[in-house]
């Protein structure tokens, strides 16, 4: 998708769609017993419902995508809290797990508890479910032998017999999938990941222009100055927010929106708020009186160092003066409105 509003269309026509990793997940559920997610997994994502679009954390968005494939239950595990059922869930699922001797809570937090529970979870016949290993890069620390033993147990569980589906769950994937949430793809050892046909890798990208624009609209209620804007100005400001937030997560946009309102920038000053958030200071060096004074003396300073190149000095001073005085856009708050390029000095 293009990041240029000229290509993407007017702000009012931008449309948020389901995250791109949804389609990759749907395919992987049909072909792989385990799926490894890396990338921007700690962000917010659009969830499309009949009442509109909501932006939810990854786990909630994952649960919606699994439900669309007939997987109603999500059992999550992390090294601190152990096994738990991701809400909302059917009460019957918790009862079925208890009947199979699967301990929820901190009792299943360690590698031994996970090793004991996984074969029963992945072979659960009563209802299709998925197992999410959150913070999977931290499952076993400091003991390569224990880590390898756990991975071998996981591999055996994934390759074990698939549960027998009842007719009511015939549309669900044949296997209960195991889902990894990793910091980086290299967190799984090479011997386990390379050539493993049961493992599918999915990288979650940063939000694109449409997602940022849609979330900017979601955040518009944060700003008090939107009450004085008409529809055209509001759309332009939201588009500016989306463009300025290029490279940011949606969670970062939410943080910046709260910062902009607290600092008195409002939506109209969102570009300045983002500039401050990116560089970590309110100071703008292009507004410095000392900088302007140095540019005013720039010809004298350059002429003392560069001999016989008056034309080069003239052109250099023109660029610097336009940058500082506001004619080139180099000091403009808006990043996407600035000219881009480099000035090389050679000789």
Residue ranges and their predicted role:
Residues 154-191:
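Sensor-1/coupling segment of RecA-like P-loop NTPase cores
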Residues 2-21, 25, 29-37, 83-87, ...:
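AAA+ P-loop ATPase motor domain of ring mechanoenzymes
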Residues 1-149:
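Extended, compositionally biased accessory segments flanking or bridging domains
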Residues 113, 117, 149, 153-156, ...:
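Well-ordered alpha-helical segments embedded in enzymatic catalytic cores
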Residues 41-44, 136-139, 184-188, 207-211:
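Conserved nucleotide-binding/hydrolysis micro-motifs of P-loop NTPases
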Residues 121-124, 160-171, 223-228, 326-334:
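Alpha-helix termini
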Residues 129, 174-177, 339-343:
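Residue-level recognition of the N-termini of beta-strands and the immediately preceding loop/turn
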């Amino acid at each position: 998708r293009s990041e240029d509003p000229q290509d993407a269309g007017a702000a009012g026509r931008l449309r948020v769609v389901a995250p791109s990793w949804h389609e990759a997940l749907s395919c992987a559920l049909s072909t792989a017993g385990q799926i490894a997610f890396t990338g921007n997994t700690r962000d917010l994502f659009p969830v499309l419902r009949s009442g509109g679009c909501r932006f939810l954390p990854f786990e909630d968005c994952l649960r919606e995508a699994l439900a669309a494939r007939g997987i109603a239950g999500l059992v999550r595990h992390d090294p601190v809290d152990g096994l738990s059922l991701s809400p909302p869930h059917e009460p019957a699922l918790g009862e079925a797990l208890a009947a199979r001797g699967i301990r929820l809570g901190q009792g299943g937090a360690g590698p031994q508890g996970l090793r004991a529970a996984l074969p029963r979870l992945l072979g659960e016949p009563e209802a299709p479910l998925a197992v999410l290993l959150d913070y999977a890069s931290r499952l076993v620390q400091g003991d390569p032998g224990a880590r390898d033993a756990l991975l071998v147990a996981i591999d055996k569980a994934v390759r074990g017999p698939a549960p027998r589906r009842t007719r009511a769950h015939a549309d669900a994937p044949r296997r209960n999938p195991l889902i990894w949430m990793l910091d980086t793809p290299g967190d799984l050892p090479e011997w386990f990941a390379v050539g493993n046909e049961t493992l599918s890798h999915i990288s979650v990208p940063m939000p694109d222009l449409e997602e940022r624009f849609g979330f900017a609209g979601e955040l518009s209620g944060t700003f008090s100055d939107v009450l004085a804007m008409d529809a055209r100005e509001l759309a332009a400001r939201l588009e500016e927010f989306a463009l300025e937030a290029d490279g940011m997560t949606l969670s970062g946009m939410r943080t910046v929106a709260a910062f902009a309102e607290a600092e008195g920038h409002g939506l109209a000053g969102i570009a300045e708020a983002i500039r401050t958030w990116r560089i970590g200071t309110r100071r703008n060096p292009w507004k410095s009186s000392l900088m302007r004074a140095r540019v005013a003396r720039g010809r004298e300073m350059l002429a003392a160092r560069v001999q016989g190149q008056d034309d080069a000095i003239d052109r250099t001073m023109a660029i610097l003066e336009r940058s500082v005085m506001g004619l080139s856009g180099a000091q403009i708050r808006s990043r996407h409105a600035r000219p881009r390029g480099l000035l090389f000095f050679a000789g």
